[in-house]
Amino acid sequence: MGQADQIAVDVIIPVYKPDEKFHHLMKKMGQQSIRPANIFLMWTQGKTEEDEELQERYKQVEGVTLVPILPEAFNHGGTRNQGVALAKSPLVLLMTQDAVPKNAFLIENLIAQFAEEEVAAAYAKQLATIEVGIIEHYTRQFNYPDQSQKKTKADLQRLGIKTYFCSDVCAMYRKSVYDQMGGFVTKTIFNEDMIMAAKMIEAGYTVVYAADAKVWHAHKYNGKQQFQRNFDLGVSHRQYKEIFSGISSEKEGKKLVLQTLVHLWRKKRIDAIISLIWQSGWKFLGYQFGKRYDKLPLWLIRMASSQKSYWNNGKG
């Protein structure tokens, strides 16, 4: 516990209609080699009796603070900012409710990245679960390889948009730098993590991909969901064009598709190749429409987006 005495970590987790993965996550938090000083559950309130019972259950857990969030008040950046503002530790760990630590060393391995003062953020490797299929497994390996990596402004030419990649599925931040950057942007449909990473890198800090810090996390999206998710991605790139306009993300997307295609061909998975082409088409269309959202009528934007409530006040 000597290391824990030297540097403390607070954990912030937005919660909405949690399932078994969340309970596994909380159990794993209690088993970490370095335990978090505090866990702040930013709980978007449901209207069911079951949800109320779960809230009461976690209110009783030592070290856990449950912060009620009204559904209409939830914001990807703002809600996380609210949690970070409550934190007193020098490091804060942001997680989603469906990210389950693989072992007891997640927090320890992330903390280790901050031995160097210039490191402002570190994010974990995401492992695909069995049920998501071969395409998602390969995508996870592509985006989260076995080799750790330090990323600085000098890597923009080589890595392109991947320089700014960071995921709040499981990412630790140096709170002093986070505050210096003004926290997460509050007006964004999502992608607050990459926007923060971009600001940190542009300010001269380092973002680390820590391959030895691992969480189980993956999704199995259908064509419609792929379209909507990538529509929202395109929206965020359009809204923050000062960050993303000079760096193409489409080149990286093409590289992923081609490498996945080769992998599936070698595995003789013709069925998966057909699925890959289908999904990639929806991704591409969604992203292209999202980048041009400001030219679309609001009713069409609502249909295309996965974040319906984001558009309640118009195009913004």
Name the predicted role of every residue range.
Residues D232, G246-G316:
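Non-catalytic, C-terminal membrane-associated alpha-helical segments of glycosyltransferases
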Residues K153-Y173, I189:
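A recurrent flexible, glycine/aromatic-enriched loop bordering the glycosyltransferase active site
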Residues V92:
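Short aromatic/hydrophobic "clamp" motif used to bind/position activated sugar donors
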